[in-house]
A protein has these predicted regions:
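Membrane-interface extramembranous regions
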Residues: 1-123
Length: 123
C-alpha cells in the first residue's frame, strides 16, 4: 500500500506543480486561451488557486518524506480535494468536462485517507 500511495502522491504532486506554476506565474490574459474558466475569476483569485496548488504539491511529498510534521501530508491532500470539488462546481456551471477533476479528487482522497490511516497506525 505504501508504494501505491507514494506513486499516486508523486503523480499528483507533478500535476499540481505544473498547474500551480502556470496559474501563479502566467498572466491571466494568456491563461484564458487554454483555461477558459479563468475568465470568470480575477487575476488574484487565479493566482491564489495556483499558490494553493503549489503548496498542496509540496505538502503531498515533503512532510511525509522528511518526517517533519507528517500530519501536513494528509491535510494537503484534503486541501486538494477541496480545490477539485470547487473546480468541479465551476466546470459544471460552465457546462465543461469534469472527468479529469473527478479523477484528481479521487486520487487526492485516496492519499488523504491512506496517510491518515498510516498516522493512526491502522495500516
Amino acid at each position: 500500500m505504501d508504494i501505491a500511495v507514494w506513486i499516486v502522491s508523486g503523480l499528483l504532486a507533478v500535476a499540481y506543480l505544473a498547474a500551480g506554476l502556470m496559474k501563479t506565474f502566467i498572466a491571466k490574459e494568456k491563461l484564458v486561451k487554454n483555461l477558459p474558466w479563468t475568465e470568470d475569476y480575477s487575476a488574484g483569485t487565479v493566482r491564489f488557486i495556483g499558490i494553493a496548488e503549489l503548496l498542496g504539491a509540496i505538502g503531498l511529498i515533503a512532510p511525509w518524506l522528511t518526517g517533519i510534521a507528517p500530519i501536513l501530508t494528509p491535510l494537503a491532500a484534503v486541501g486538494l480535494v477541496i480545490v477539485q470539488a470547487l473546480a468541479i462546481r465551476t466546470h459544471i456551471r460552465r457546462h465543461e468536462q469534469v472527468i479529469a477533476n473527478i479523477v484528481l479528487l479521487v486520487l487526492a482522497l485516496f492519499v488523504a485517507a491512506t496517510r491518515f490511516l498510516q498516522l493512526a497506525g491502522t495500516i
